[in-house]
Each structure stands twice: as C-alpha cells, then as structure tokens.
From Swiss-Prot:
It comes from Mycobacterium marinum (strain ATCC BAA-535 / M). In the presence of PdxS, forms a dodecamer of heterodimers. Only shows activity in the heterodimer. GO terms for biological process: glutamine catabolic process; pyridoxal phosphate biosynthetic process; pyridoxine metabolic process. This is Pyridoxal 5'-phosphate synthase subunit PdxT. It catalyses: aldehydo-D-ribose 5-phosphate + D-glyceraldehyde 3-phosphate + L-glutamine = pyridoxal 5'-phosphate + L-glutamate + phosphate + 3 H2O + H(+); L-glutamine + H2O = L-glutamate + NH4(+).
Amino acid sequence: MSIPRVGVLALQGDTREHLAALGEAGAEPMTVRRRSELDAVDGLVIPGGESTTISHLLCGFDLLEPLRARLAAGLPAYGACAGMIMLASEILDAGVRGRQALPLRGIDMTVRRNAFGRQVDSFEGDIAFTGLDHPVRAVFIRAPWVERVGAGVTVLARAGDHIVAVREGSVLATAFHPEVTGDRSIHRLFVDIVNGKA
C-alpha cells in the first residue's frame, strides 16, 4: 500500500509535534487549513489546543461543515485532548454562547471539557491501552474525559475511573497528548487505521 497522506488541522494547537510524530509513524504528513487540503488527505489529526478557538476558526475558514461531511462519509480521524472534545457528538461545559466548542460528531460520545481541572492540575502517568502491548505515557493538560459512549464505541484506556481513550470505526480519540512523549504507538495505530490494517 502507498504511504497515506495524513493531515493535521493547523488552525491552532500543537501542529508541529503531530506532523513529526506522523512522519515517524510512516505517514506523509501535511497541514490542513483549507478545503482543498482537507479534500486531499486520507486521514486527519485534530490536535490539542483550545476547543472553542478551534471551533471559531473552523467556522472562519469555512471548514466546519466540510469536515463534518467528510467524517460522516468515513474519513479516518484522530483527536488529542481538544481534538477529542471536537470529535464528540455532545460537549458538556462547551463554553459561553457565541464562543462554544462545536461538536463534529465523529464519535458517539459525551465529553466534558477541562474535566481534570485547570492548567496547574495537569499531570502525566503510564496507562494501559487496549491493543498495545505496553503502557502508554499519557500527558494530561487541562484534559477532558468521556462521560458517555454509544454502543458502537470501544473504550481503549482509562485514568482511574475516567474514560480517556476511545475508538468508533476509523475515528480515534485520546484525552492526553502522545505527541509530546516520544512514544509513537498511538500515531502508528492511527496510521494503521488509515491504511485499513487496524
């Protein structure tokens, strides 16, 4: 199979780290800021950042509805932290009216923004991750958690009692930031999903 072209939504957030991780994981990474770039990718990463800002910029760049349409048509996607929030079908504590995080509805789940607390409450630790043969180093920065999953959603990881990684079909989401750890397991898993191998 040819090397998949995987985009990173480059409107706000830690784009550079995901581009590097995808390259190391065997993909051809590219930034996505325009509809033509979105149309050219085989998969998309929605990075961490600020979900209300990303939502505002998706609207400003006329990408919100095209992205929702591509997800509905089966585009493989991976969301980390704010990206997990964006991929939800429902967002709790979505923000003030007119400046809210807007759900892309890629995964049938309810996510609570900033559930683990403020920036000073950020933490990291090793967690078990279904499908991987080793624990994953998880860095949580003002992280969300999943409060509800639909019947078709697989829970991949928990931190304590809280769901922090899920998958539905070809859409993957984590509440943590694997791109900052040097462990490329999650990005390799996503590249395999894009290639139809996982």
